[in-house]
Amino acid sequence: MPFIYINILLAFFISFIGLLMYRSHLMSSLLCLEGMMLSLYILGTLLCLNMHFTLSAMIPMILLVFAACEAAVGLALLVMVSNTYGLDHVQNLNLLQC
């Protein structure tokens, strides 16, 4: 296994561990999710280029679109929670029920 794949997988797992450890604030959770999506995008792109998968070349772009949608929804939720409660704690998300 090439060294770059190990680095990208290590970046994914570090972001995942960060998501598990720093889950009290919504902003840190969103940053860890973005790190995970970025490492998955790079890994998918490298695999498509190195394995010559011409039919699946659109999969990394689709993943990037979903990452952008996830970031937009996460930031909108962060703005709504911080305007309503003044904090960005994840525990305030349970209070947003109708």
From Swiss-Prot:
EC primary class: translocase
Domain of life according to the entry: Eukaryota
Protein's UniProt keywords contain S-adenosyl-L-methionine: no
Gene Ontology annotations of biological process type: ATP synthesis coupled electron transport
Any one GO CC term of the record: respiratory chain complex I
Coiled-coil ranges (or none): none
Subcellular location: Mitochondrion inner membrane
Transmembrane feature ranges: 1-21, 29-49, 61-81
Chief place of localization: mitochondrion
Membrane topology recorded in Swiss-Prot or TrEMBL: Multi-pass membrane protein
EC identifiers of the protein: 7.1.1.2
Record field: catalytic activity: a ubiquinone + NADH + 5 H(+)(in) = a ubiquinol + NAD(+) + 4 H(+)(out)
InterPro entries, per the entry: NADH_UbQ_OxRdtase_chain4L/K, NUOK/Mnh_C1-like
Keywords in alphabetical order: Electron transport, Membrane, Mitochondrion, Mitochondrion inner membrane, NAD, Respiratory chain, Translocase, Transmembrane, Transmembrane helix, Transport, Ubiquinone
GO molecular function terms noted in the UniProt entry: NADH dehydrogenase (ubiquinone) activity
Sequence similarity: Belongs to the complex I subunit 4L family.
Function: Core subunit of the mitochondrial membrane respiratory chain NADH dehydrogenase (Complex I) which catalyzes electron transfer from NADH through the respiratory chain, using ubiquinone as an electron acceptor. Part of the enzyme membrane arm which is embedded in the lipid bilayer and involved in proton translocation.
Oligomeric form and interacting partners: Core subunit of respiratory chain NADH dehydrogenase (Complex I) which is composed of 45 different subunits.
UniProt-recorded name of the protein: NADH-ubiquinone oxidoreductase chain 4L
Natural source organism: Dugong dugon (Dugong)
Classification lineage: Eukaryota, Metazoa, Chordata, Craniata, Vertebrata
